[in-house]
Amino acid sequence: MESSTLNENTVNNYIFTPTNKNDLQTAVDLWCENRAEAQNIYGLISNWNTSLITDMSNLFLDKMYFNDNINNWDVSSVTNMTSMFDGAFEFNHLLNSWNVSSVTDMDEMFEYATLFDRKNALWYNFN
């Protein structure tokens, strides 16, 4: 799908479905650098279908100003969330709808995510 052919209605209804971490990382990087361009290419980040992704480690690493709602992401296949929000200082959205039962590694997932409210991820052990 070429971004030049997308109209606003198409963009808002388009669901990006990355098949691997690199595709997802590329989309996240662009979203954090140029939201308008990313939205034209990938649609709204809150609508992305992440059900095929198994590794989200470092996904928002040092994305200091990232603070978008990704509570609807399907993370049920993810096994690695190490440092996922490490350095995402401003991130503070609910993640309570996430099914993290497959995750085996959450080390430093919210390291330096200083504004993150622990109540937004009741499944996470902050010890």
Label every model-predicted segment:
Residues 1-127:
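Negatively charged
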